[in-house]
Amino acid sequence: MVDIHTDEEEKNFWKKLAKFLRRHGVHYEHKELKREYMRLCRKYSSLLQNRYPDNKIEINISDVFYELCTLKNSRVTREFSDAFGYIFRAESRAYFKVYDGVYDMLGELNRQGVKVWLLSNAQAIFTMPELEQLGLVRYFDGIAISSDAGFKKPDAEFAAYLFAKYPEADITPEKCLMVGNEYGSDGKVAENAGMNFLYAVSNLTPESERAEYQTPSQKE
């Protein structure tokens, strides 16, 4: 749906972030900032994985940013650390754009009365502002983000989270068609949760999967 590229290894990325934090009373040098960020990501991943050893887990990066900031300044609010998280994402993002035809497709589904939900492996503090900026939120009847659920595709628990989040919609697996461009996550979550699956080939699709899942007309 969205073509996005981020680079957290760009030469000045961590320097820019450290400079921003220092201006707001959170004193890191860039190397320490990167080191602590990576450490906290590992910490939260380990804690959640220990709690759910058999699941594909997804941490909430908002917790990482909050602890990262409060380690240096206990007066930092969650509002500030989330704002820093948005800056983190914006600085790391090389580009993001909607794939050709997505607006038309979603609009047509809406016009035909088809209910559309988004099941996304993502961080809410990154992705929700991007969806708003791209004008995509209005097309969906509901959105489930893995960082809010604590689980990610291909775990069936993430699909169950979506179904439970919108009980009034009476969503059940057999009523759903999962559409995605990554077989390992989208196809497998459909399989694990009992949904049908439509494979959408994109520039992210590995060549091996393109060949394996082509339709007969494409092969011809």
Whereabouts are the PLM-identified features?
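N-terminal helical cap/lid subdomain that shapes the substrate entry/recognition surface
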Residues: 1-99, 111
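Asp-based, Mg2+/Mn2+-dependent phosphohydrolase catalytic module
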Residues: 7, 28-31, 103, 107-110, ...
